[in-house]
Amino acid sequence: MSVKKIIKSVVAITAVVVSCLNAYGASYTTKAVPVGASKKTYMSYKAITDRTSYQYKLQKRATTGKYGIRTIDGRYCIAVGSYYCTTIGTKLDIVMENGTVVKCVLADGKDNKHTDSSNRLGRNGCIVEFIVDTKSLDKTCKKMGDMSYVSSGGLKGAVKSIRVYDETV
């Protein structure tokens, strides 16, 4: 699906925002994503260079986990568009169409000038950008430019929704 078609479908979609409580009592909001959004790119954690930023401080706490993805408290470090969240350190869950829930934390934000008009998708159609150590990055993901190709298969397919928690790491 082309980015133009995705953007048109975004305009046609009415965002469903529901407040919920998870098993631990933490509240979250479920945010709708454009239909068919499946591209999950990556960026090097070394691209975060402002030593005074919270993003930089979070990366000092992060470790490189499985597939080369940076993690904090067992959550993958990601960047998403401002529609979903802007507070660095916020806990997020990426809910896949196949039912897989990927626990994440907002470790960097996508600049609005690099997203579509709704601030949901990157200009390249990316829904989520994983923050990685490129030296440890899964080889297939590196070749394809998409984290959907991690060997576990847990990131394959379209994203159904994004849960934004009312708590940070």
Regions found by a protein language model. Name each.
Residues 24-169:
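Solvent-exposed, well-ordered loop and adjacent helix/strand elements within mature globular domains
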Residues 1-28:
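Gram-positive cell-envelope targeting signals
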